[in-house]
């Protein structure tokens, strides 16, 4: 496939909405044309969180959530098409990541589960849909994540400048794009996830807007050291994680060991944990001249300020400064991965995921004969 118009659909660990992006894509260029964020109903969000955090469930509940998410993702695509005055015939394919409810890359056997029925998306939109991107990489011994570094390299790598791309979603992940070196990428640990969980529990707010609550507190050093002592932070790459590990139950275990910390100081310490765990991994990966940040955490002034302070000598900016809207980065990546799949080209990077080989990713759900 030489070119086409693709739609990428992404619902990440932050659960702050379904991101939908339209882009014209060919071998040399990804040109974003439109974007839209579709709301996630509150009850559906609660159902997702319950499943992600290991609460007991049933096959019926899993199947129902899979169908509900397929419908939600299809509605998000249809809303974007209506907003832009487009029809199904204008679109080559959809690339849908799905909603991760469990990710266990070190299991025996390793597995990952993304819900959102791609058959339903294809049927409701009448657009060929590519999904289930992660499990083929796992079948070849990889972690199935992260997959976005290949896209970061295609768009943002530089011939001489040492660059890294940092996505701060619910989980933070880093793409290491150093000249004349293999591409690397991995999850550094919690991004917004723990901060969001804590402010939701205490203030019934979905996130700490402008870090106002965190800025009212102070970092508690014993608590920070207790949390940063978690074995995940010392694991070598390749490594990946998610809400099934860094969640409210994990936080409660840490707090039980350091009692008496005020709620606002806990929020400030969680922001510091995100910044420290990221910058430590940047240093261990060799450092960079320029750190390009995307995701919701790029709008957290405290986290961004701390990253800049901890990485003196590195220019810390957003991907918006490089011409790519940070909020759309991951959805755009899965539109690009759908293009790679339909072009018969590999989408994973063994140097990132640990897979034994490059491979074409995803399953294709057509709406007509090929």
UniProtKB/Swiss-Prot annotation:
One of its GO terms (biological process) is 1,6-anhydro-N-acetyl-beta-muramic acid catabolic process. Pfam families: AnmK. Pathway: Amino-sugar metabolism; 1,6-anhydro-N-acetylmuramate degradation; Cell wall biogenesis; peptidoglycan recycling. It comes from the Bacteria. Gene3D superfamilies: 3.30.420.40. Its EC number is 2.7.1.170. Keywords: ATP-binding, Carbohydrate metabolism, Kinase, Nucleotide-binding, Transferase. The keyword ATP-binding applies. It is an enzyme of class 2 (transferase). It catalyses: 1,6-anhydro-N-acetyl-beta-muramate + ATP + H2O = N-acetyl-D-muramate 6-phosphate + ADP + H(+). One of its GO terms (molecular function) is kinase activity. InterPro entries: Anhydro_N_Ac-Mur_kinase, ATPase_NBD. Coiled coil: none annotated. SUPFAM superfamilies: Actin-like ATPase domain. ATP binds at residues 12-19. Catalyzes the specific phosphorylation of 1,6-anhydro-N-acetylmuramic acid (anhMurNAc) with the simultaneous cleavage of the 1,6-anhydro ring, generating MurNAc-6-P. Is required for the utilization of anhMurNAc either imported from the medium or derived from its own cell wall murein, and thus plays a role in cell wall recycling. Belongs to the anhydro-N-acetylmuramic acid kinase family. This is Anhydro-N-acetylmuramic acid kinase.
